[in-house]
Amino acid sequence: MQNRTGILILTGVIAAICIYFLSFTFVSRSIKADAEAYATNKQGQFDRAKEQRYLDSLWKEPVFLGSTLQEVTERELGLGLDLQGGMHVVLEVSPADILRSLSGNNRDPKFNEALKQAGEDQKTSNTSFVDLFANNFKKLAPDTKLATIFATSANRSKINFQSSDTEVRKLLNDEVNGAFGRAFQIIQARVDKFGVANPNIQRLPGSGRIQIELPGVDNPERIRRLLTGSAKLEFTEVYRLNELAPAIEGMGSYLLREETARKATAKASTPATGTTAQGNSLESQLAQGSKKDSTSKSDTAAASAQGTALTQLFLPVGQDQLGVYLKDTARANAVLNAPEVRSLFPADAVFAWDRKTFKATDGKEILPLYFLKKPGGRAPLEGDVITDATNDYDDRGRPEVTMNMNAEGARKWKSLTAANVGRPVAILLDNLVYTAPNVQNEIPNGRSSISGNFTVEETKDMSNVLKAGKLPAPTTIVEESVVGATLGSEAVSAGVLSSVVGILLVFGFVVFYYNRAGVIADIALLVNLFFLLGVMASLGAVLTMPGIAGIVLSIGMAVDANVLIFERIKEELELGKTFKQAVSDGFKNALPSIIDSNVTTFLTGIVLFIFGTGLILGFATTLIIGILTSLFAAIFITRLLLEYYIRNGKTLTFSSTWAKKLFADSDFDFVSRRKLYYTISSVIIGAGIISVLFRGFGLGVDFKGGRSYVVRFEKAITTDDVRNSLEGVLGASPEVKTYGGTGIGANQVKVTTSYLVDDNSAGADKRAEATIYKGLSSLKGNPAHIESSQKVGPTIAYDILTSALWSILLAVAVVFVYILIRFKKLAFGYGAVVAMFHDVLIILAIFSIFNGLLPFSLDVDQAFVGALLTIMGYSMNDTVVVFDRIREYLNENRGKKESIPTIINNALNSTLSRTAVTGFSTILVLLVLFIFGGETIRGFSFAMLIGVIVGTYSSLFVATPIVVDALSNDQEKDNGTPTTIEKKTGFDAIPADFTSAEATTPEEFTAKKEKKAKTPLIRPSQS
């Protein structure tokens, strides 16, 4: 073996790097185990806060090779959300709000209608929002230039009223893209300060979206606030209620007229004494500012009626704010925004809600309402003047946020506080009043604080977002997935079990089949596994459940390289060559097939990596790394081990006694029965098409949009009971499937619904979850808990579906081009592509036909698409190995009196042993994954299991016959002139009896040969 020393050095270097990076994982796990033990008392009770204190104490301390615990944690092989719990979020920066801001909040009805229509169109289009808006605006206002909307004073340095629509579009696209970049930086800063170990934040190219993965978080609502709050900080004056007395009295008149018009008979009870902060009636507060002095009975009665109508909705909770029962806030918003009511208030008056409710003495929750003074619609002081913000404690020991301002901010703050001594100044964050303290004296130093009824976490988050800065536009969550820690730990157990069992079975089978040589293969496979994990750790990759599936599958497929090598060595030994020469020639002959087969799977993995997100990205990562490490292990490690035997004068046996004659002298006729195989495949595909037309697929939530919840009950539950309990509260029947069980005695279900899927408001997720709990509460005596949740908006569902289709088409195109380049003949490309489409259609048919009939989910989702692409890669792996052997046999028999069908049949029989061993070992692994891998990948592993069986079938009974037919259709012979079939195959001569008058078809030729005693072209030693 040449360069043996160099390969040994390279292997040692790679091993040292892997040990170095994996050591961080072991140290991190050890410290976390110590923290868990420290936080668990003798009774077995676990204190999470105590564990966190232990970890925090070491966070900045050196714990390993000079690295702090924080650095060790960042370098460990991280676990994905599905294995340790956490939250996956995809944020979308609102382009509509950016355009509104650029227009100066233009109220043109056609402009706003175009924005609205663009939002609807974006749900089913890949066109940019700006182009959709511009097209809609052109339809609504064909004679109006975009410049009339966007040529504001703020934009005059870039465009003017004479600017063309093209110039305005360019500005809008630049601003939207710039806002996306700024939003990404701000979100990244917020997440980095949040303190999550190994967060993953990345842009999703071409989509204007940001993907965030936060392992281990257990407070989704806090994360939602952190990510979606725009951090718009404002300081503004507050109107006293007596200063707005005429307007509020007029609002009472409006409510009275509205009540009379509706002829409402039911009246809400007046709040009980003690529900207000002041104890004074609203009427008495307003009277302080009223100039009227009429005391006539009719006026008094009218005023009383107005006051009653007013206090039924708006309650007095202080001299600076009203209050509204939490359940009545929607109606209050409608009243305050009514044009008739809005006209009663000063032009600079705006209303804003407090961030928190308080409980009245009657137990009901009241939300305070403030009337703020914003001349020109803008606050006199905004958050862009803040230079620093820290969470601290006030003089009463309460958590607060202290802020420092720049020079301009300090000057404005001094002026604002000086003008409002003895009056309140409100501090708002994202249009919610956080505090409105009375100013005691002017504040000259640019310092201010936000204090109130806050927790330490709230002040920490508040200071975080203020320091990170204001988002250029609001963000909305278009996709969300929350995995509970319990579900994650179960996935870890299932993943470890399936991995260990699968790998042990493969190791055992290899030794059982190849005898002592199998031990060498197993050592190479172990090295492959070690390198794979080490490379993943060095790249900062995250291990997910599909990632574990990818590792186990790569081990199964890595067997193929060793099988190809061993089969070739066996052939050379049986030709009488020495062990040393047989090893050398065996590696040389096996290498083309190994490279070709792995390149096709590698290309499929690249497509998955480009188009995949979340769990599929994890699978693609491990698949790509696994292919590279398995190639290195098979080509170099196996060779080094065999060279060790050669140097010590030892030999090896490459087959067990029972396996030696298993495929010896096999003479199966693959070609002549090809029409039967075509018919079998056509029937299955036809049945699948009928099923798709009448039954369709069970689409996953990531393809159809909606909300999905995994719910665990204390006791066994039926899907019908869950469906019936939720139908009333959700307004429609949800989809309910058993999750993680066989349906009998199962206590987990997966609920999918479209409830509030289009609602991107701050409280939509919480309301949806509360509605689910409300419905499930009717199942008396069987408490339920939501273990995980997922939300996918309609826009992102469309994008996911589109990218999935493109990924499949791209994979087909890439593999076709590679086959064409490698084999230089269209016939082989046709066979490979037809076989790929055959495999995909068969899997689709099975998933449609058996959907709802099997005791596990057959949803078509992103994981399913990943399985399809992997199946295509595996099928190509198998097909290319077969094609390589066919090409070799055709070259060996060039110009001989043998037909193409006979040559191809012999080639297929010679590789039958390799096909069977590789297929069986891979199926063995997938069967273990299917049984023990857990619900997360059950549908995925089922698709893979069926796919490997179908892929093995198609390489022998579809791809190869297609090649034969493609060549047979051009049977020509012209007295020494190269025929079309010769041109297609690149051979010098066509076998005479393939085109003779005696046997004009492959079937006739085969029948003729069966009547004769023939010497097969296949070597007796081949198996």
Residue map of PLM features:
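Non-transmembrane, solvent-exposed regions of membrane trafficking/translocation machinery
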Residues: 22-31, 53-64, 71-430, 434-437, ...
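Hydrophobic alpha-helical transmembrane segments of membrane transport and translocation systems
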Residues: 8, 527, 534-535, 571-592, ...
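Interfacial segments of transmembrane alpha-helices in multi-pass membrane proteins
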Residues: 3-4, 401-402, 406-421, 425-426, ...
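Juxtamembrane "pre-transmembrane" interface segments
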Residues: 213, 445-449, 457-501, 766-817
